[in-house]
Amino acid sequence: VTGPSDPALRRSRVCYDHLAGELAVRFFSTAMSHGWFDAQHLPDESTSVRLLPIGREGLARLGIDADLTADPVANTRRPGCRACMDWSERRHHLAGTIGARLLTHCLQRGWAVRAPDSRAVVFRKRGERALFEAFAE
């Protein structure tokens, strides 16, 4: 493990416009193991992944709209889903339009808050529970 020595940044932080850190890596790993995404290959750097129907349903249980067809930003060259290498965990977390929606949703629902003057994202206990409840279905 490399990266920040600050435990809060290791735990959860913003990477551009999406979640990174231990919690984000665990979420993406759990989603992959539950068949939410199909990764053709995951090289050392970022790569596109495909959101599968079961993943669309899981995101809906979380309250996240996974429809990319009506979103003008999503219809740009930006991928809908992308695996982004987490530099502190050396494993992938979720990026792209869906990754950004996940971060926005967590903040809007009050599951997490941005730490002042930091990239750290602090999850409340109920927020972390809610984030993983969709996998219990």
Identify the role of each PLM range:
Residues 1-137:
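Long, charged, low-complexity, helical-prone intrinsically disordered regions
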